[in-house]
């Protein structure tokens, strides 16, 4: 069984790699963003608790997010393994996750960091654009829609660039993320769980390297 966390700065290619891993290994793809939306829509107790913070514009405390993760990891589709997306972001969250996975007997098997140089990430992120309708992500260099001007996923025709994908904002965002990412890598390296792949390569090669790590274990 594979229970996996992918680490990497924005633009490193975690989304693409996650899709490829899920397709091959049939893991549950657990995204904290999706979890929040689902729990709030279903009005679960934890969802309502999270909503009370979000509605006030406050950050959701780690303990509340951890409850949400525990609720999600207890669902049936996780029995073949999971890939966690967006959690943990800090060592405090990593410690909470250790407690959860121990309680549920679903310990992590792999933590894979996708490493990419800062200048490459700035180029990638400032070339990124999204479908206004469904949020599918594209890149004007490496991942254009199959039909120009038409979203592959939903057929929409309107696209936009996020404010935080503009070059002047990207550099600052990367620095903030790196400050959070570095201690996490160290945390999992000390536990002997961390492997690193070169994210400068084409997505197929990045996935081949990840696949080699996952197949080995």
Curated annotation (Swiss-Prot):
AMP binds at residues 32, 37, 58-60, 86-89, 93, 162, 173. This is Adenylate kinase. Pathway: Purine metabolism; AMP biosynthesis via salvage pathway; AMP from ADP: step 1/1. One of its GO terms (molecular function) is adenylate kinase activity. Residues 31-60 are annotated as: NMP. Monomer. ATP binds at residues 11-16, 128, 137-138, 201. It catalyses: AMP + ATP = 2 ADP. Zn(2+) binds at residues 131, 134, 151, 154. Its EC number is 2.7.4.3. Residues 127-165 are annotated as: LID. GO terms for biological process: AMP salvage. It is found in: Cytoplasm. It comes from Lactobacillus delbrueckii subsp. bulgaricus (strain ATCC 11842 / DSM 20081 / BCRC 10696 / JCM 1002 / NBRC 13953 / NCIMB 11778 / NCTC 12712 / WDCM 00102 / Lb 14). One of its GO terms (cellular component) is cytoplasm. Consists of three domains, a large central CORE domain and two small peripheral domains, NMPbind and LID, which undergo movements during catalysis. The LID domain closes over the site of phosphoryl transfer upon ATP binding. Assembling and dissambling the active center during each catalytic cycle provides an effective means to prevent ATP hydrolysis. Some bacteria have evolved a zinc-coordinating structure that stabilizes the LID domain. The keyword Cytoplasm applies. Belongs to the adenylate kinase family.
